[in-house]
């Protein structure tokens, strides 16, 4: 590993290139508007590590610019990964835009290895508030972890204050342990391992162990920490027997910036082992390659893909789906679920979505606000294709997101307009967890509300305009939201365009204009491969 000066920050970039146009691919690193480094030239089919010492920046915040000199984006299968001084992944992504994409990344550690903590041990009882920030630990001893060699008797308790940052997506906490452990952030339990259920006491013994002490971790939403303020990390270590033990605990906490645009979400960057019950090319479902895909054949639904995470265990509360140009064959309905008991067939639903529509080469993101948890394994069930009898999943990325609990129902649009009889109406809330849904006043004739999903669908039978309020429930809490709907008569000529094609339809388009090339003009991009597609009914003047 490269050794950096005290005023420098270590970083490792891993760049993957393919066999074509690798010489067009590069990246730059900035601190604000200041260019700090430019990547070296990369070779054909290369997986290359580049270590660098960056100058210190405010809170060690930087940005990476993904560049393609050919202005046709990186080749499918090319990606870049960024790791910090402890080898933890702080960014991983691939390029979809033609010539440039910009992402923030953070090399800030709220807690670093070998720092000073507060330490004590108990053999009988401990104050219940010991995990809270306001607890008085002045009587606890100071211990610099990693070099503290004294033995202590009983269950070991640790406390460490730290400062988090604003506008982050997640944090990664890795801890060095062998036996039982329970960790808390600001008084809330965030992790336990090798421990029975229930509130632990100093006499609670661990259950199970690793062969030796090593670092194991979690990635959780940054909403669990207070930005730019004091926080407390509290950890208790339990052992198979009550006795005297050495102190071999240590930990670090990395604060992670968003790795997708528009939403405060972090893409899981470590390797993932995937397996499926049916279909082909399952490894393509999450391989940072934009044109590879996993297929669920006709008549073989549901396609079940299990994600087994090899690095820190993520608290997945978001899913991002890349449809490439196959928007008609991308998953039209799915369930994302998790479980902690590998011997059980029971899975807990986290996110479910149906009647999904896509735009060609545009990500679609789904969130879970109240049904997420820290699971050992996750499963993605594809229930149907969006508009085909089979399904293709090009890239399904698990996300850890900083999400605020919703205060109301927000729809994909505040206002909708559709033509009478000729357009299929689909109106859905952005949050997919709402249920027990009702609407007032009554919907126009031809439309109905699904009370389980809050999705409104159908075809308007007559012209009407109005504002509608939907009431729904999440975990016994009522939420409300409204939208305006205009169902209008077509005053001109209705044109239905049907077009067939074999491949690369996303490169083609058409326009409809009046005779003097003014007024109406509508250009539609088509994206599904090898399918007959009815574009839409188009009203013209």
PLM region spans:
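C-terminal edge beta-strand
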Residues: 478-488
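Aromatic, loop-rich ligand-recognition surfaces of beta-strand-rich domains
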Residues: 257-262, 280-349, 362-404
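Solvent-exposed, low-complexity, repeat-rich "mucin-like" stalks and linkers
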Residues: 406-437
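Strand-loop-strand motifs at the edges of beta-sheets in extracellular beta-sandwich domains
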Residues: 445-461
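Short beta-strand-plus-loop segments that form exposed binding edges in beta-rich domains
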Residues: 15-18, 65-72, 235-243, 380-388, ...
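Aromatic-lined ligand-binding clefts that engage carbohydrates, nucleic acids, or primary amines
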Residues: 12, 64-65, 140, 162, ...
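Edge beta-strands of jelly-roll/beta-sandwich modules across compartments, strongly enriched
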Residues: 73-81, 242-251, 387-401, 508
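Accessory carbohydrate-binding/adhesion or oligomerization-edge regions at the termini
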Residues: 2, 6-8, 91-147, 172, ...
């Amino acid at each position: 590993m490269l050794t950096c000066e005290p005023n420098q920050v270590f970083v490792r970039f891993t760049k993957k290139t393919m066999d074509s146009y690798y010489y067009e691919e590069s990246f730059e690193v900035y601190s604000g508007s200041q260019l700090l480094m430019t990547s070296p030239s990369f070779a054909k089919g290369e997986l290359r590590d580049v270590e660098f010492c960056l100058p210190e920046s405010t809170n060690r915040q930087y940005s990476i610019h993904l560049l393609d000199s050919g202005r046709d984006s990186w080749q499918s299968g090319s990606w870049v990964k960024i790791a910090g001084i402890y080898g933890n992944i702080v960014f991983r992504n691939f390029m979809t835009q033609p010539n440039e994409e910009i992402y923030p990344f953070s090399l800030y550690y709220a807690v670093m290895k070998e720092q000073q903590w507060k330490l004590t041990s108990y053999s009988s009882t401990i104050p219940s508030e010991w995990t809270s920030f306001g607890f008085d630990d002045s009587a606890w001893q100071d211990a610099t972890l990693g070099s503290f060699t004294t033995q202590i008797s009983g269950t070991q308790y640790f406390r460490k204050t730290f400062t988090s940052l604003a506008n982050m997506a997640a944090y990664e906490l890795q801890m060095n342990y062998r036996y039982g452990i329970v960790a808390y952030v600001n008084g809330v339990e965030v992790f336990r391992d090798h421990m029975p259920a229930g509130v632990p006491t100093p006499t609670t013994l661990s259950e199970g162990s690793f062969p030796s002490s090593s670092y194991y971790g979690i990635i959780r939403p940054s909403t669990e920490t207070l930005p730019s303020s004091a926080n407390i990390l509290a950890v208790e270590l339990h052992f198979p027997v009550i006795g005297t033990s050495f102190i071999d605990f240590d930990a670090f906490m990395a604060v992670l910036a968003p790795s997708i645009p528009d939403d405060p979400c972090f893409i899981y960057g470590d390797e993932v082992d995937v397996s499926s019950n049916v279909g082909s090319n399952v490894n393509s479902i999450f391989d940072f390659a934009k044109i590879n895909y996993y297929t669920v054949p006709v008549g073989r639904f549901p396609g079940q893909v299990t994600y087994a995470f090899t690095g820190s265990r993520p608290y997945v509360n978001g899913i991002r789906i890349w449809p490439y140009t196959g928007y008609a064959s991308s998953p039209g309905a799915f369930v994302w679920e998790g479980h902690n008991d590998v011997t059980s067939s029971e899975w807990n639903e986290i996110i479910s979505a149906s009647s999904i529509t896509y735009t060609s080469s545009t990500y679609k993101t789904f969130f879970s606000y109240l049904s997420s948890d820290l699971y050992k394994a996750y499963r993605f069930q594809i229930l149907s294709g969006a508009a085909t009898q089979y399904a293709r999943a090009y890239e399904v990325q698990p996300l850890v997101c900083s999400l605020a609990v919703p205060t109301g129902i927000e729809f994909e649009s505040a206002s909708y307009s559709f033509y009478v009889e000729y357009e299929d109406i689909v109106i859905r809330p952005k949050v997919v967890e709402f249920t027990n849904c009702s609407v007032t006043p009554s919907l126009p004739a031809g439309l109905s509300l699904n009370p389980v999903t809050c999705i409104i669908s159908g075809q308007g039978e007559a012209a009407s305009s109005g504002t509608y309020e939907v009431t729904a429930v999440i975990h016994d809490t009522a939420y409300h939201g409204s939208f305006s709907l205009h169902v209008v008569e077509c005053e001109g000529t209705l044109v239905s365009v049907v077009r067939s094609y074999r491949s690369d339809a996303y490169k083609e388009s058409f326009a409809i204009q009046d005779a003097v090339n003014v007024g109406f003009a509508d250009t539609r991009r088509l994206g599904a491969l090898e399918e007959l597609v009815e574009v839409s009914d188009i009203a013209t003047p």
